Structures are given as structure tokens and as C-alpha cells.
Amino acid sequence: MSGTVTMHSVFVYGSLMADDVVRLLLNRIPQTASATLPDFHRFSIKGRVYPAIIPAKSDKVSGKVLFGITDDELNVLDEFEDVEYERENVQVLLTDSSDEKLQTKTYVWAKKDDPDLYGTWDFEEWKQLHMEGFLKMTKEFAEELNLPKSEI
């Protein structure tokens, strides 16, 4: 009996764009490609250092796609994103190539009318201001899930 291994792709647009965060969670860095998710907006969230996306016509979110994500890794990402996000299937445009369209998964903020969403979240600002503390939190999260130790 041969088992079929399902591989997934996941569009990430926040803290998971940082290789160090992904390495702590998956114990590896998957193959990636830059991508854009049309008709969504990336918001900051009051009191949080990570972003949320919700549908927004005529807007787009830049991020990247993680390729070759296993079922187990997808479960880890589901746990990491928690109940505040819903995993949804979306279509992104790969920006490294010829704007190829790709069906993929992403995590959308569950509460679409959340009054705590505001402005636009900035990855570069997050890296400078919050990444160090976020890595510490992510490492603790990985340890709680008994994930394999990363080199970080």
C-alpha cells in the first residue's frame, strides 16, 4: 500500500515572510516565489504586531508563496495562525515569472468587520521593530507543540 503525499502551497503576507520564523515552525525553508494577492488588503491590528488580510476590491497584497508544504506542516501553520484566521483557497499572481496565476491557500482574518483593523501593515517596519521578540514567541510556540528544534 503506497501512501500519497499531498503537497500544498501557501501564500504568506506577514511574519511568515521572514525565513527565520518559517524555519522555527517547519524546521526548514521551503521553496518560495514572490506573489500578489488581488482584491485583498493587509491591515495592522490594534495591539498586535502581525497583520490581517480581508477582501478589498481594487487592492492587492504583496507576499510570497511557500511551496511543498506537507499536511503536517500545514497543520503546524493552522495552529500558528490560530482561530483568528480562516484558511481559504485563493488565486495569486506569481510576480517572479510571467504573472502566472496559482491556486493556493492563505490565512484570512475571520472577523471581517473587526474595528481593530486599521491602516496598512508594513513588513520592513515589522522586521525592525518586532521581529526579534516575535522570533522568541515563535520559538516558545514551537517548543509547546514539540516541533523539531531549529538551528536558530
UniProtKB/Swiss-Prot annotation:
Name the organs or tissues of expression.
Answer: Expressed mainly in leaves.
Q: Which residues are involved in binding substrate? A: Y13, G14, S15, L16, M17, A18
**Origin, by domain of life?**
Eukaryota
Keywords in alphabetical order? Acyltransferase, Transferase
Quote the InterPro entries the UniProt record gives.
AIG2-like, AIG2-like_dom, GGCT-like, GGCT-like_sf
Residues annotated as coiled-coil are none
- Its function? Putative gamma-glutamylcyclotransferase.
* Family stated for the protein in its record: Belongs to the gamma-glutamylcyclotransferase family.
Record protein name field: AIG2-like protein D
